[in-house]
A protein has these predicted regions:
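Cytosolic juxtamembrane N-terminal segment immediately preceding the first transmembrane helix
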Residues: 2-41
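Extracellular/periplasmic helix-loop-helix junction of adjacent transmembrane segments
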Residues: 49-75
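Hydrophobic transmembrane-helix bundles of small-molecule transporters
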Residues: 175-284, 288
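Helix-loop-helix hairpins in multi-pass membrane proteins, especially solute transporters
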Residues: 75, 81-211
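Paired intracellular helix-loop junctions of major facilitator superfamily
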Residues: 59, 139-149, 385-394
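A helix-boundary/kink motif common to multi-pass secondary transporters
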Residues: 58-59, 89-90, 113, 144, ...
Length: 458
């Protein structure tokens, strides 16, 4: 759900504009916003349907893998499409991304095993991962300077409606027609987005300078993180430890090439911003991704109710974004600290969902606090990060921020999934397993509040 808000959350205060857009620019703007809306609906709806999918296909042990593989494929696609866009322009990479996304929807919709769902999710992640950096590039290249802040606002607004209705729609569709239709219903939007965007994109060629390729590093980083996440699911302790070590050995050096130097110690400036994004995504989504599972397995809630529980956080996330857009004078360090504090408070507020006697409406309200915190910190981190981008290198910085989101989400998704799998085959209860994940997320929020002090604009 919320992992995809990070993609399009750069909203800044706007001055009245006088530049008129031509027909091609207007068509492109509508198409880009529709593309964001499509991705937002997919992310939010699938998160709601996933407990039902794993239940029907007996795939609890792959719950975390289904979350993480989407993000890992996203990671590679971010780098690949960013480089292809710099070299060849945005049209062909964007069309290829839409095609891969469509293939992923079809694979998941027809899947008879959880392994095929995981493959479909990986293809979906690869497709949507290509859309985000291209959208940022096009805002810079296709629209006048005085229109760019408003375009970021429109892209962000593309998340509002899906955040409100996708969980409920996905739950209702799953209840009455089956979870496969959650994937099928998105397919008709893809050709519409393609028709509206691809042709106008051909007018905007590359303006950036060619850099050394980072694709190999992205592949190794994804392979390492995938090995790490998969190893966490192994029953054999020795195999799990070996897999974790192998994953870290392959993944960490590659991530160091992809992320700003000094991100591991939250060095002042861009590294601290990227570190905060990674910690925020890990802390928030490490809880948000498992609330529907808790509602399903602990409270025996229907898919509709599972989706409803996380709507509050989605709405408050958007509200927090727009609040920061209207108050750009707030120091980003203060805003990010407030954001992490709200995330931590929200985690404490939803911890009782692990008890079967706790009312789910209280979880709805409690997790809205965490969503507000995410809204407070995402605009300042995005705007501050982009202030460090040199002309022609906006895509590089944008991809680094998005990579941080991917790393944070996939890591906590893998750890949380491992806890769920462990509860299946040991005496550890599911509430206990999720409680460990929630506690780790709370600790990461606290660490993020400390790192926020190193944030600085260029």
């Amino acid at each position: 759900m919320a992992f995809g808000c990070a993609r399009f959350a750069a909203v800044t205060a706007t001055k009245p504009t006088i530049t008129r857009l031509d027909r091609q620019q207007r068509l492109l703007a509508v198409g880009l916003v529709l593309g964001v809306t499509m991705v937002a609906f997919e992310i939010t709806a699938v998160l709601t349907a996933l407990p039902s999918i794993t239940d029907q296909l007996h795939g609890d042990s792959l719950y975390g893998v289904a979350l993480a593989c989407y993000t890992l494929a996203n990671l590679v696609a971010l780098v690949v499409t960013g480089e292809l866009t710099d070299r060849f322009g945005p049209a062909k990479p964007y069309l290829a991304s839409l095609t891969v996304f469509a293939g992923g929807l079809i694979v998941a919709a027809t899947a008879r095993t959880m392994v095929l769902v995981v493959i479909g999710r990986a293809l979906q992640g690869a497709g949507t991962g290509g859309l985000a950096p291209i959208a940022y590039v096009l805002v810079k290249r296709a629209f006048p300077v005085d229109r760019q802040p408003k375009m970021y606002a429109y892209l962000s607004a593309g998340w509002v409606l899906p955040s409100l209705i996708a969980p409920g729609v996905a739950g209702t569709v799953t209840d009455h027609f089956g979870w496969r239709w959650v994937f099928w219903l998105l397919l008709p939007l893809i050709p519409v987005v393609a028709v509206m965007t691809v042709r106008p994109m051909r007018a905007y060629a590359s303006v950036g300078t060619l850099r050394g390729s980072r694709i190999a590093a992205a592949i190794f980083a994804a392979a390492g993180m995938g090995t790490f996440v998969t190893a966490l699911q192994f029953k054999n302790i020795a195999a799990a430890i070996g897999g974790v070590i192998a994953g870290l050995t392959v993944g960490l050096p590659s991530l160091r090439r992809l992320l700003p130097s000094g991100v591991h110690r939250a060095a002042r400036g861009l590294p601290a911003v990227v570190a905060c994004r990674m910690l925020a995504t890990a802390a928030f989504l490490g809880v948000d991704s498992f609330i529907p599972l808790a509602a399903d397995r602990i409270h025996d809630a229907s898919p509709t109710i599972q989706g409803f529980v996380i709507i509050g956080a989605a709405l408050s996330w958007t509200s927090g974004q727009w609040f920061m857009a209207q108050h750009p004078q707030i120091d980003p360090r203060r805003a990010v600290r407030w954001g992490f504090a709200m995330i931590g408070l929200g985690i404490c507020a939803v911890l009782p969902v692990l008890s079967s006697g706790w009312p789910l409406w209280a979880t709805f309200l409690g997790w809205a606090i965490g969503g507000w915190g995410m809204g407070l910190l995402f605009n300042p981190t995005t705007v501050t990060a982009m202030s460090h981008a040199r002309q022609g290198a906006e895509g590089l910085v944008s991809s680094q921020v998005n990579l941080a989101d991917a790393v944070g989400f996939s890591t906590m998704g893998g750890i949380g999934g491992a806890m769920v799998a462990l509860s299946d085959r040991t005496s550890l209860s599911l509430p206990g397993a999720l409680g460990i994940n929630f506690a780790l997320a709370f600790a990461l929020a606290g660490l993020g509040a400390i790192c926020a002090g190193h944030i600085a604009a260029a």
